[in-house]
A protein has these predicted regions:
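Glycine/small-residue-rich phosphate/adenosyl-binding loop
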Residues: 1-57
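Solvent-exposed alpha-helices and their adjacent loops that cap or buttress functional pockets
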Residues: 1-2, 25-27, 92-96, 119-121
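Short secondary-structure junction motifs
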Residues: 2-5, 73, 100
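A short, acidic/glycine-rich surface segment
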Residues: 17-20, 42-43, 86-88, 110-114
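Small-aliphatic-rich amphipathic alpha-helix that forms the alpha element of a beta-alpha
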Residues: 33, 41, 48-89
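Short secondary-structure boundary segments
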Residues: 37, 80, 107
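C-terminal helix-cap and adjacent tail motif
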Residues: 101-131
Length: 131
């Protein structure tokens, strides 16, 4: 486990505003995590050259989301963002890194509910095969 994930924690109003300019969804969270990975640190599968940096960063993101929920915090995984704008907004912090997600973090509003796209599930038969 090479741990290629890199987390940029955005807390200032200025930094949060810069991140907002890179994404189509905004959640007014007091903290935004920029989850990236360093390709130079990522494990490469020998058999086909697959770089696992994105996978490792996604696993770390899932663990952060679970830990946040245990602490009573809400998170929203944002994959719809412009990585080039994000790199331009944070050139020093993201130099050489590949951003994979923004993670909005904070206490959810009392009336907050996930959209139906986040609760509807395909039938298990469409996703799992047995042999």
């Amino acid at each position: 486990n090479n741990q290629p994930q890199r987390i940029l924690v955005l807390r200032s109003k200025e930094a949060l505003a810069l991140a907002d300019g890179c994404a189509r969804s905004h959640f007014d969270s007091p903290v935004m995590l920029v989850v990236s990975y360093d390709p130079a640190d990522a494990w490469i599968r020998e058999e086909d050259g697959k770089n696992h940096g994105e996978i490792d960063a996604a696993i770390a993101t899932t663990q952060m989301m679970l830990q946040a929920a245990d602490l009573g915090l809400g998170t929203t995984y944002i994959g719809m963002f412009d990585p080039e704008k994000l790199r331009a907004a944070f050139p020093e912090e993201l130099a050489g890194l590949v951003p994979i997600a923004l993670l909005a973090l904070g206490y959810p509003a009392e009336n907050a509910r996930p959209s139906r796209l986040h609760t509807e599930r395909k039938p298990l038969e469409e996703m799992v095969r047995y042999r």
